[in-house]
């Protein structure tokens, strides 16, 4: 069966495909389930501390995006949410913070990279010019993932945390990637609260 060209998918090594789409409010339960499946180490690397449960206010904020200052892409395996890449900025600013989390069973298979590349494209299309990632200094996998973006970067460190600033103001996106980013933004904005 040929993949639908209007659907965004990430192929896995075993031949299955993950559907990529913007997060929606009705993903709340699936997001909580993903968090429950994460190892303590994955949670620590994502949130910089112990966080056994997501607070309802966080779930609400994480699943309600506006396609402008707040946006998130999810990777779905059937009805299971298996990865999230998000940015969150402030109104009137051209920068945003990013975060990525991938189900432990799918780490190191290119899912995080594929989602992050798409998130960067969406951020550029949304008019952002800088993305910032705060990463624990010992999180070599995330630091390596950010280096794969092939965009100008600057790093700052306070010893425990490395902040990677990614410059998005460079070259224009290829047409196919720009169109994919526009589709994701349009889908997110169509379900955004007024």
Q: What residues fall within each predicted segment?
A:
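Long, contiguous binding/interaction regions
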Residues: 1-194
């Amino acid at each position: 069966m040929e993949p639908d060209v209007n659907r965004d998918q990430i192929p896995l090594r075993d031949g299955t495909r993950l559907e990529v789409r913007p997060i929606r409010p009705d993903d709340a339960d699936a997001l909580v389930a993903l968090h429950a499946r994460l190892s303590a180490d994955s949670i620590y690397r994502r949130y910089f501390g112990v966080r056994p449960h997501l607070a309802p206010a966080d779930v609400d904020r994480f699943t309600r995006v506006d396609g402008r200052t707040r946006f998130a892409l999810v990777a779905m395996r059937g009805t299971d949410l298996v990865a999230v890449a998000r940015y969150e900025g402030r109104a009137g600013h051209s920068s945003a913070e990013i975060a990525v989390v991938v189900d432990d069973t799918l780490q190191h298979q290119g899912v995080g990279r594929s989602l992050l590349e798409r998130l960067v494209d969406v951020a550029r299309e949304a008019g952002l010019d800088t993305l910032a990632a705060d990463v624990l200094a010992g999180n070599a996998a995330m630091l390596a993932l950010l280096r794969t973006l092939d965009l100008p970067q600057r790093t700052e460190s306070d010893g425990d945390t490395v902040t990677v600033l990614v410059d998005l103001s460079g070259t224009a996106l290829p047409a196919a990637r720009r169109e994919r980013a526009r589709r994701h933004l349009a889908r997110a904005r169509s379900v955004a609260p007024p």
